């Protein structure tokens, strides 16, 4: 038997050896395998010949060689070498974050995550990127960041060969193949493949909009939507077309634009096999087969929601397009625009054509008139391949084909 003083000395010895241990094994047994003998028993790993003073440490070592992970999460079936790792993991599902920062009360599910966070308050950022000079509190964060410079994506999906820079992104991607959705909303029981998706969804119940614009005070539930909104104020358009160098604020807008160059029309109507460049155009077209939008006053149906809205104004006697100088109102915006043109007939015509001295209110009208003299027909109909001038009906015909 050991006295309390001897046991205290042993614990001190373990802590000291733990701090200077040159081995690269799991931290849970580093301090154990470095001690040759305490109570007279030595446990040796047959694979790597390391010696341990505790049988548990030997078992942990052997699992690193065999790949055995006996502890399984019953929520997502992920497996672990140690029971303590399983307990830490289960906090993700239970939303349990027992490690709280004393400075800002932010909570974490793992003590290592808390340690990394606390460095931000202490101003300690030990890990610096040698390419851009950015500092990080944890070496793992630096490693992931450096992949943004190198383009390295070491995590490969075995199903579709897609690569990722983060292991968490790969885990989330795999769920698109398995259909697994481990994160469930307690309010409506809707399930999600990613925790961030669940958090965003929960804000629909709470009404929380944590991302607020300091320019116009508009707020958002999603960080991605907030980033896109800020570009309205900054004018930033980071997504550039390689074919014509046109820039866009959103990646989705760039993808749609690029189809102008490639001719790709990925959205196909299963009724008539007609294809479209945008999903919104397909949805609008599909309504022509079903007559989706119905008036509640009459049994009249419409292909587009906008047509139904205009029709309903007849019942409500609503005329939203109001002339500022009198009480005249219009159901349709196009009627309002036509009236504006009539009222400005006597006003100055700014755009004059030098060949025939004809003048116009708008530059677009002047450009359209020029084609009468030049004979140019720059717009080609995709069906008949006829050349078209820029006139309202023909322009509409050309746009409907995309």
Swiss-Prot record:
Cell location: Cytoplasm; Nucleus
Zinc finger C2H2-type: from-to: 43-65, 71-93, 99-121, 127-149, 155-177, 183-205, 211-233, 239-261, 267-289, 293-315, 351-373
Keyword Lipid biosynthesis among record annotations: no
Entry's Gene Ontology cellular component terms: centrosome; cytosol; nucleoplasm
Disulfide-bond pairs as recorded: none
Modified residues (Phosphoserine): 391
Any one GO molecular-function label of the UniProt entry: DNA binding
Pfam families: zf-C2H2 (PF00096)
Major subcellular site: cytoplasm
InterPro entries cross-referenced by the UniProt entry: Znf_C2H2-type (IPR050758), Znf_C2H2_sf (IPR036236), Znf_C2H2_type (IPR013087)
Family matches, as Gene3D superfamilies: Classic Zinc Finger
Annotated keywords: Activator, Cytoplasm, DNA-binding, Metal-binding, Nucleus, Phosphoprotein, Repeat, Transcription, Transcription regulation, Zinc, Zinc-finger
Domain of life: Eukaryota
Alphabetized PROSITE patterns for the sequence: ZINC_FINGER_C2H2_1, ZINC_FINGER_C2H2_2
SUPFAM superfamilies cross-referenced by the UniProt entry: beta-beta-alpha zinc fingers
Function of the protein: Transcriptional activator. Important for maintenance of pluripotency in embryonic stem cells. Binds directly to the POU5F1 distal enhancer and the NANOG proximal promoter, and enhances expression of both genes. Can also bind to numerous other gene promoters and regulates expression of many other pluripotency factors, either directly or indirectly. Promotes inhibition of MAPK signaling during embryonic stem cell differentiation.
Subunit structure comment from the entry: Interacts with POU5F1.
Other comment: Significantly enhances POU5F1/OCT4-SOX2-KLF4-MYC (OSKM) mediated reprogramming of mouse embryonic fibroblasts into induced pluripotent stem cells, and can also substitute for SOX2 in this process.
Stated family: Belongs to the krueppel C2H2-type zinc-finger protein family.
Protein name: Zinc finger protein 322
Primary gene name: ZNF322
